[in-house]
Amino acid sequence: VKSDVVLIAFLLSVASPFAAQAGTAMQTKGKAFPPPAFYSFCSRQPGLCSTAGGTKVVALRPQLSAQLNEINLSVNSRITEVSDRAVVGKNDDWRVPTVSGDCEDIAILKKLELMKRGWPASALLLTVASYHGEGHTVLTVRTNEGDLVLDNLTGAVRDWSSTPYNYFARQAQGNGRRWERIGAAKSVGTTATGI
């Protein structure tokens, strides 16, 4: 099964939709309020709330693209989406899932797995949006090819502006406890640092 996930991740990275088109970066436009359960999560897991670090934009190489795809697919296949109410008896409870969780839990696990592989916390931002009138959380990865979204609703890693969501806010780079409102998309340049 693991070899199948790696093969699929490699094939997706080669045929990656964000490799063929110009990517976009999220423009931020001031302070936003974080989701209510975010602060209690940060008190329990400060390392996963961090966005500290010097690398703000990762230079995306084929092996890193493959890692994004592999982790997105692997976590999506291992973790069953279930509401917080069903799992812990609360409407909103951010945590690292082991078997099941909702969208923010799944995004947190993806951030954890990328950080274990050496990805900088400063380029891995928890991001909130809406989809069909419901709140939704994804992981945004800042790269020189655009801000890419790892999402529990799809196996595809996509440029954020190519998703069906209305984005509200994301963690601020350099201060993970602060959140910023999301504005328009801006074409990306080529300035990035490796990991």
Question: What residue spans do the PLM features occupy?
Answer:
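An exposure/low-complexity boundary signal
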Residues: 2, 17-19
